[in-house]
Amino acid sequence: MTKVLLVEDNEMNRDMLSRRLIRRGFQVVFAMDGQQGIDLARSERPDVILMDMSLPVIDGWEASRRLKADDATRSVPVIGLTAHAMSGDREKAIEAGCDDYDTKPVELDRLITKIERLIGTAKDEALRQAV
């Protein structure tokens, strides 16, 4: 079962997205701010992280940078999520270390396609490094 770390401070968004992911067969772990997301990424070892970019304590931009700078979490794919579909946000998310980017409200099939692609890429990379 694919483990998703959902880092989202908005209870309604967190509830709605997690229920939809669970119905599609994902295991979901929650964090409500960027620091908690970093801590849970280290302890829970998720397959993918869905990172809201507007978070308290440490925002998603900085949390993504820290995750990608940490040997323990750098290989975990991060998908940045934001309600702001501004020009340049995707590029900003990639520069912050996100592997992909999506807008809210989330279109679930599109998001799952991104998750599956990134998990496949991460597993391929892990196999190459193991050889």
Please give the residue ranges for each predicted region.
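Conserved acidic carboxylate
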Residues: 8, 32
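Charged docking surfaces used in two-component/phosphorelay signaling
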Residues: 15-23
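C-terminal output helix
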Residues: 106-115
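The feature encodes the CheY-like receiver
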Residues: 56, 74, 86
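Active-site beta3 strand of CheY-like receiver
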Residues: 44-50, 55
